[in-house]
Amino acid sequence: MPYFPDIERIRYEGPASDSPLAFRHYDADKIILGKPMREHLRMAACYWHTFVWPGSDVFGAGTFKRPWQHAGDPMELAIGKAQAAFEFFSKLGIDYYCFHDTDVAPEGNSLKEYRNHFAQMIDHLERHQEESGIKLLWGTANCFSNPRFAAGAASNPDPEVFACAAAQVFSAMNATQRLKGANYVLWGGREGYETLLNTDLKREREQLGRFMRMVVEHKYKIGFKGDLLIEPKPQEPTKHQYDYDSATVFGFLQQFGLEKEIKVNIEANHATLAGHSFHHEVATAVSLGIFGSIDANRGDPQNGWDTDQFPNSVEEMTLVTYEILKAGGFGNGGFNFDSKVRRQSLDETDLFHGHVGAMDVLALSLERAAAMVQNDQLQRLKDQRYAGWQQPFGQSVLAGDFNLQSLAEHAFANELNPQAVSGRQEMLENVVNRFIYR
C-alpha cells in the first residue's frame, strides 16, 4: 500500500514557482562546473529522524502517528517502514539514504536475534535499492541506545560490552559492503565520560584506538572500497566526548597511526556545540586532509543542545560548499540530511516540506559557491596576503635553511621592521555577500 498517496514526485519548477512541494533551485541534472548538480551534492535522507523518531523529547512522549510506527510484529513493521522509506526517497527524488543497523531492523532480545533480523532486512533493502536506483551513502551501527552502552561502547570498562559493539559494527560494515555503501560512519555517541572520578582516560583512549584499528583491518579484509568516517561531537549524551571536533579527531588518529585510514563526517550542529562555525570545521578537516562527508542540519543559537533542524541558511551553506569545491568536491561523501521536523509538524507531508526546502538551500548555495570559485577573488586576495612566503626568503625559512639562531641573526643584521598590512575583512565580507545576494 502507498504511504504517501497524495504526494506526487517532487519536480523542479524554477524560482517563480508558488507550489509548496516543488524545487525552485534544485535542478538535478543542471551542469555546474562541468558536472550535474546531483553529482556535486550527493544528497541523502536519513532513516532515523525521518522514519524512526516518534516525535518524543525528554519532557514528553511521541507526538507522531506514522502509519509505519503503529503497534504490531516488529519484523512486519520494519518491512513496512522500508517500503515507506523508499516510497519517500523516490517521490522526493533524492539519490542516497543512510541508516543505523537498529533503524532498519528490530534489535530483538539477543545478539542472535539482532543478527537474524538485520540479515533479513538487508535482503529487503537490497531489493528496494535495485528497484528504485537509490543508493546507500553510508551505514553505521547504533552502539549508544541499548542500556549496555550506558558507559560507552569501545570505551566501556567491561570488555564484554566492547565485544557486543564489535558484533554490531562487524554486522553493519558487512551490510554496508553488500549494499554497495559509499562510506561507513563511526559515531561515538557515548564514547566519553560523565565524571572523571570514575574514568581512566588513558585506558579508554587506548581501547578506542584498538577498536578503530580492528575496524580498519576489517575494511581491508572484506574489500570495502568506501571511506571510514568518524563523526565529531563535543558532548551530548555524555558530558564530554572523545571525538570533540575535527582537530581532536585528527590528533587521535595520528596517535594510533590512522590518519591515512579514517576521515571525518562533519555535522553542522555538532560544530556549533563545539564552539565552532560549520565553516571552520569543514575548512579545518580539508586543511588536515581528513574531510569526508557532511551531515547537513542546523542548531538553534538559543539552545545548547542538538536540535537537528533542516539547513535554511544560504549564507552559511555557500561558504561551506565553497570550501568543498575548492578542495575538489566530495569523493565518496555527500550531504546527508541529519535533520528532523519539529514535534508539532504532525503530518507526513511535513517530511517533504523539510527536505524540499533543505535541498533547495543546498542547490542555491552550490550555484553561489560555484560563481565564487569561478571568480575567486577570495583566493587572489589570500595569495597576495601570503605572497612573502613564495619569495626566496620565505621559501628558505620553510625549507629549513635557517635555525632559530641564524634566523634571529638575519633579523638583527637586516634591521627588519615589517609593517602590518590590512586584512581587509570588511571588504571580503562584502565580496561574499555580492555573490550570495545577487
From Swiss-Prot:
Cellular compartments annotated: Cytoplasm
Record-listed Mg(2+) 2 binding positions: E267, H270, D306, D308
Cofactor: Mg(2+)
One biological process term in Gene Ontology: D-xylose metabolic process
SUPFAM superfamilies referenced in this protein's UniProt entry, alphabetically: Xylose isomerase-like
GO cellular component assignments: cytoplasm
Protein name: Xylose isomerase
